[in-house]
Amino acid sequence: SSILYYMIGQRFRQENFGSKLWQCIEEPNSQALSFIIKEFLKQAIGAWEQRITFQSITVTRVDAKIHIEVTYVVNGTNSSQYLDITYDRSDNSLNTQ
C-alpha cells in the first residue's frame, strides 16, 4: 500500500513509483472522480505489484470521505485479499487497513 502514499516522481531512484491519487485532491467529489480513482489505482498497483490480480475496486463517496475497497487474488496461492482505503478530503489524510 506504500505505492498509494507516494506521488509519481517523489521517490529517489524510482521516479515512476507511486500513484496519481494525489492529483484528485482538488477535484469535486463526483461519479467521475470515482472512475478516475479506480483507473489511477489500477495503473499504480498494476505497474508495481505483479504478485496480485485485481478482482474488484469499489469507490463510495460520503461527504468529505472517499472509501475505496480493493479485492484481489495473490498469484501463486490463489488466496483472496482485501485492502480498505479511506481518503478524508477534510484533512487530506489517506488511511489503509
Kindly label every feature range from the protein language model.
Residues 1-39, 43, 55-97:
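Immediate N-terminus of the mature polypeptide
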Residues 46-53:
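Short secondary-structure junctions
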